[in-house]
Amino acid sequence: ADNKKGAKIMEDEIDVILNHVSHLDVSNRDAFFVIAGLGGGTGSGAISVVCNSLKQIYDEPVYSVGILPAENEGDIYTLNAARSLKSLLPTCDAAILVDNGAFLHSGESVRQAYDRINSDIAKRLGILFRSGEISSKSQVAEMVVDASEIINTLKVGGICSIGYASEAVPKKRIFSKFLGKDQYETGKAARIFSVVKRAVKGRLLLPCDSKSTSKALIIIAGPPDQLDRKGIEKS
């Protein structure tokens, strides 16, 4: 778990990675995301080297996704993460951090929770990456979040976190028999506000006080007829 050795190895091999990146079809890329665990020696040492190299070559912003070790993983992993963050933050445009400990159930080890934590991370990043995508069969939403808005939000830099919440959409025909149109529309707005509140107050990738944030972006995905403007604006 020697992150200095990890950084040295990456410095020696960085040309291999950059060569692979240069051969990818990235003509429509908006940004780079570099993902690594910050507790071990390899990821904690290598991530800042990769981010710094990408920033020197490409104009697009470079974001890091760093996985922080849980408290029960050991002191050396905590020390590696602290050292890694110190070198990482100056080399990337923003750092999205994930606290392994925040996702563990009582008495559970990281190894036992590995798949679930990865799934939660992928779910949040997946919504972020798909923002603004429109397929030929899709209905275009009234308001669309695109890559430029995400980049503008992350422009403040520093440490970032992502929240997530979901709710099943009720079948309209069940409720429309008992509620008038105005009541049904009010219900949609309240549901959106509730989902956003749970995303912010619930399980963030990195627990933090939302009042201390410099900027925030709300992304709501779902059937267009359920995305009530009043609910979104209230959120």
Residue ranges of predicted features:
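Tubulin/FtsZ superfamily GTPase core signature
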Residues: 1-235
